[in-house]
Amino acid sequence: ARALGMPVLGICRGAQFINVFQGGTLCQNVTPLRVHTRHRPLLLPLQTVRLVADSGLRRWMQASVVGANRIHSQAIRRLGRDLRVVALDNDGFVQAVEGRDGPWLLGVQWHPEYLLYHAGHRGIFRAFVEAALNFKRSRLEPGPEGDSPILSKE
């Protein structure tokens, strides 16, 4: 997907895969390392997450602090190349990463698909769909007669 310029959204394990794919590492069990946050999985948005000021995530969620859920015990340890941290929890664990440049790339450690009743979490999906539509449009070219678009073969 990255090589083709496709937008990528990684949720929970997907965010971890993005980091590992980019050469980063994971902490296998953060539960005993937590000091300021709950040690059990939470489906409700009871975890406080702070968003970086100049990030796409903050712009899409239209907030500086959000509530998030947590269903994982792993976290990013060493950040992968060409990624930047855009959200942290109260224990300082990475909760979201974005690509530094290139195609649209976002990985969130929580599950926004369970929180669609919050406008900010819907904003993540709105931004992803917009990026996907822009990608699709960029791959369209006029047909042989110049009237009907076809996908380019590149």
Model-found features: residue ranges?
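Amide-donor transfer/coupling interface in amidating biosynthetic enzymes
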Residues: 2-4, 31-154
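Class I SAM-dependent methyltransferase SAM-binding "motif I" and its flanking Rossmann-like core
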Residues: 28
